[in-house]
C-alpha cells in the first residue's frame, strides 16, 4: 500500500526528526531535502528509507549529530572536513565554494573527508551543471565488493557521477554505482522480505545468491566484472586515499547503529568549459542529436527529470515509510 504526501510535509517531518536527535536546523534541512529529492527522482534506495539509519546512528554517537563542516581553500583545492557528521551539509558547503572558484580558475577539486553516506551522486553534479559547470563526483563506501578473483569485500560500491550543462534544457546526468546495482536496493528487498534477482550479489563463499541476507553478508557483483572492480579501486584511491579517510574495508556500516564513524571520503571536480574552448554548449549538442536520431536511445538523466516534473509537489511513498516518518517526528524520536 502507498500513500500520497506533499514535499512540504515530508520535509517538515524529516527536519523535525533530525533536529530531535541534535542535528542543527540548516544541516537538518539540507539532509531532509537530499532524501526527499531522491524519492522524487525515483531513487528510493537513497531516499527516506535511509532516515531511520541516520537517526539511530545520531542517537548512538556513530554520527556526530551537531557536526558543522569545516572548509579550507588552498589554490584550486577546497578541503572539507565533515567531522563525522552527515554528508549532505559538507557536500553543500563544498559545492557553494566550488561555483565561484571554478569560474575564476577553470578547474577546482572539492575533497571531503571524515564523512558519511554520499547519497545520490548525481545530485551535487547536477547542481554544479545548473550553474554552467561540467562536474564529476566520486565517493567510497563501506566494503561490499571483493577485488576481482577474491571473496573478501574490500571496496565499497563506490558511485561515480558526471553532469554537463545544456543550452535551454536540463543537464545531462550520468550516475552509476560500480556494483551491478546499488547496495541500497538489496536493503530495500530485505526490508520488504523479497528475494533479489540472480546476478546482483554473491554469498560469503562467492556463490550467486537471491537471498538479501546472504548478499549483505557476502559481496556485490561489480558492474563489468574485472573492469568494475578496477574502477572501484580507483575510486577508493581518489576519495579515501586523497582525503585520508577510511577505505571501504576500514569503514563501518551505514546501516548498523553502533560502532565508530564510517569516515569515508568524497571527491568532486568542477570545470568551467569557458576556460577550455569556445562554444562548448553548441558543440556537445551535435553528439546528443546524433544519439537521439537512433530509435530507442535516450540521454542519461532523462528519466529522473521526467519523474521530477510528473510528481510535482507530492510523493507517493510506501505506507510504512510515511507512518515511520510521522512517528519519528511526532515522538521527537
Curated annotation (Swiss-Prot):
Enzyme Commission identifier(s): 1.1.1.338
Alphabetic keyword roster: NAD, NADP, Oxidoreductase
Ribosomal protein keyword on record: no
Gene3D superfamilies: 1.10.1530.10, Hypothetical oxidoreductase yiak, domain 2
A single GO molecular function term of this UniProt record: oxidoreductase activity
Reactions accelerated catalytically: (2R)-3-sulfolactate + NADP(+) = 3-sulfopyruvate + NADPH + H(+)
Keyword Ribosomal protein annotated: no
PANTHER family, per database record: MALATE DEHYDROGENASE (PTHR11091:SF0), OXIDOREDUCTASE-RELATED (PTHR11091)
UniProt family annotation: Belongs to the LDH2/MDH2 oxidoreductase family.
Function: Catalyzes the reduction of sulfopyruvate to (R)-sulfolactate. Together with SlcC, provides a racemase system that converts (2S)-3-sulfolactate to (2R)-3-sulfolactate, which is degraded further by (2R)-sulfolactate sulfo-lyase.
Protein known as: (2R)-3-sulfolactate dehydrogenase (NADP(+))
Source organism: Chromohalobacter salexigens (strain ATCC BAA-138 / DSM 3043 / CIP 106854 / NCIMB 13768 / 1H11)
Gene: comC
